[in-house]
A protein has these predicted regions:
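Glycine-rich acetyl-CoA-binding "A-motif" of GNAT/NAT acetyltransferases
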Residues: 1-5
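Conserved acyl-donor/pantetheine-binding loop and adjacent beta-alpha core of acyl/acetyltransferases
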Residues: 6-47, 109-116
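Eukaryotic short linear interaction motifs
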Residues: 15-17, 93-95, 136-138
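A short, internal acetyl-CoA/4′-phosphopantetheine-binding micro-motif in the GNAT/acyltransferase core
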Residues: 46-56
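Conserved acetyl-CoA-binding loop-helix of GNAT-fold acetyltransferases
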Residues: 56-71
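Conserved active-site alpha-helix within GNAT-family acetyltransferase domains
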Residues: 75-77, 81, 86-113
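C-terminal "cap" of GNAT-fold acetyltransferases
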Residues: 87-91, 109-141
Length: 141
C-alpha cells in the first residue's frame, strides 16, 4: 500500500461572532438561545497533506470532500458541531478557499498581500472555517 496523504481531525470550538454570514449567525443564536460571544462547537482539521508526487492532480480536493462528507454524517449522529475550522498555511489558503472555506473578516486587509506572504512566510497561519450547511451531500469524483 502507498500512503498518498493524511488528515487529522480533532474537536475544538470557535467564537460564533467570527461567522461572516449574519443570517446564519442569527439562526444559530436563536436556535441555541446564545449570544454571538459564545463558543460554537467545531471540528478542526489539524493536519492535511498530500505527498508531493501526487500534488496538483485533484486528489487533495477529492480527499477533503470525502472527509467533509464524513464530518457531516458525524454531526448528525455522533458529535454536535456546526463548523469545521482550519489553521491554514498561507501556501494552502487558495486550496481551502477553492473548497468553500471562509476567511475571517479581520484578515481581509492582510489577505490582499497574500502573494507576498506566501513568498516571505509560507507557513503563516490563517484561521478559516466552513459551515456544515455549505457541504454538498455527495463527494467530488
Amino acid at each position: 500500500e502507498i500512503i498518498v496523504g493524511y488528515v487529522s481531525i480533532l474537536t475544538d470550538s470557535m467564537k460564533l461572532k467570527i461567522l461572516e454570514d449574519e443570517e446564519t449567525k442569527k439562526e444559530i443564536c436563536n436556535e441555541l438561545n446564545i449570544s454571538e460571544n459564545n463558543e460554537l462547537p467545531a471540528i478542526k482539521i489539524g493536519r492535511f497533506a498530500i505527498d508531493k508526487k501526487y500534488a496538483k492532480q485533484g486528489l487533495g480536493s477529492h480527499i477533503l470532500a470525502n472527509v467533509l462528507l464524513s464530518m457531516l454524517k458525524l454531526s448528525k449522529t455522533k458529535i454536535g458541531f456546526r463548523v469545521i475550522i482550519v489553521e491554514a498555511y498561507a501556501i494552502a489558503l487558495d486550496f481551502y478557499i477553492k473548497n468553500n472555506f471562509y476567511t475571517r473578516e479581520s484578515d481581509k486587509e492582510i489577505l490582499k498581500k497574500i502573494d507576498m506572504i506566501k513568498k516571505q512566510d509560507p507557513t503563516r497561519c490563517f484561521n478559516i472555517y466552513l459551515d456544515l450547511k455549505d457541504i454538498k451531500e455527495e463527494p467530488k469524483n
